[in-house]
Amino acid sequence: MIENTLEKNNVTIKRQTEVSEVFGGEEVAGVFLKNGEKLDCDMVFAMIGVVYPTEWLKQSGISLGRGIIANEFLETSISDVWTAGDIAEYNDTVLNETMQCGNWMNSRGQGEIAALGMVGKRTEYKMVTFQTSHGFGDLIGFVGDTRPALGRTVVYRVAPEKNSIVRIIISEEKIIGATLINRMAEMGTITKLIKDGVKVSGMLESIINPEFDLKTLFPTV
């Protein structure tokens, strides 16, 4: 769906190849692709994801994984040392798994929790992470853990006539994450379903129906 939007807006996607060489003098003039194609250009952007600099901590004794290991209070393995931000690989008690979140909203929230811990007000970091983006008129949102890992169920709510789709990730009968395109009205509901740990077993056929109201998944009092 995203590729279709890009191509409709005159963005050319080169599939199954990659850049082998950037050429030019003091300024970039273009690139060569591995398939032999030459592309003239004025600018090159390299997107490789996030790399967490932990090399300098390897001799410190602090527990490291992909980032700095922490518990739900953002305490590291060393007493009176806290972590926060992109580097924090913490115990998420909402999703019941280890998480690492690279956005400003989490960095700010984690900074507050770490600061509270430093002044003796030990507080659990409990937040369902989300972020949004947009481009060429499409609205895109991510909430919770959006990875379709082994053992998880992935279901889709597709409405082609509205150019919208929601991919929902389910683990242990609970929704743990979702990716939304042009269906942002459901983001708040999905966030609360994740936070409340609502079980959705037996409701998959209803969930994939784009007309089904997700609010009805909440238990009635």
Where are these regions (language model features)?
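Rossmann-like dinucleotide-binding cores of NAD(P)H-dependent redox enzymes
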Residues: 1-23, 107, 127-133, 140
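Generic secondary-structure signature for well-ordered alpha-helical cores
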Residues: 3, 7, 11-12, 62, ...
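A general beta-strand register signal
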Residues: 14, 32-33, 134, 170
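Short, surface-exposed charged micro-motifs
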Residues: 21, 73, 167
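Mid-to-C-terminal Rossmann-like scaffold of FAD/NAD(P)H-dependent oxidoreductases
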Residues: 87-186
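C-terminal auxiliary extensions adjacent to catalytic cores
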Residues: 161-220
